[in-house]
């Protein structure tokens, strides 16, 4: 998916298992956002990234130029920008943010704001944030809140930038 020029996306909402912008359930999402593009809101469906991979999918996302992401929010277990829920085999985020961009991302429960979804199976993506000679990105990333499995076990929350948690019913605080 390429979003470029002066494109404005007011709202993109993923259905069950689908990213707001990117892959569907069991699908990888490759998304390029550049130019003066603006994403006002991208919300992942259950287990999916706001921008990137669907449930059990990896996300490869490039944001450059003067692009603005006002709000990228992962669904439960999905990164704001990056991978969806990994099911122990996927869910990684390969992310590049550069130039005069502004990015705001929040992970779903247990997931990274920018990076991996929950249960990426020890797989790690590559995250690059870099300026140019003329400007540098403004990035606000918030990891998802702690995960509870319904039996009273609480796992860790996700990193702002990096990896999501690995749910484990044997984990106790």
What are these regions (language model features)?
Residues 1-13, 21-43, 51-73, 81-107, ...:
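Surface-exposed loop/turn motifs in large extracellular/passenger domains
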């Amino acid at each position: 998916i390429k979003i470029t020029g002066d494109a404005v996306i007011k709202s993109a909402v993923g259905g069950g298992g689908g990213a707001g912008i990117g892959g569907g359930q069991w699908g990888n999402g490759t998304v390029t956002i550049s130019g003066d593009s603006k994403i006002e809101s991208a919300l992942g469906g259950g287990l999916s990234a706001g921008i990137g991979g669907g449930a059990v999918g990896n996300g490869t996302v490039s944001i450059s130029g003067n692009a603005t992401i006002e709000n990228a929010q992962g669904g439960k277990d999905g990164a704001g920008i990056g991978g969806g829920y990994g099911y122990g085999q996927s869910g990684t985020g390969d992310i590049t943010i550069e130039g005069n961009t502004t990015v705001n991302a929040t992970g779903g429960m247990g997931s990274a704001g920018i990076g991996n979804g929950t249960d990426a199976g020890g797989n790690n993506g590559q995250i690059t944030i870099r300026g140019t000679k003329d400007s540098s990105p403004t990035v606000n990333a918030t990891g998802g809140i702690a995960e509870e499995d319904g039996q009273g076990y609480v796992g860790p929350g996700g990193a702002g930038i990096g990896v999501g948690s690995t749910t484990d019913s044997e984990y106790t605080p």
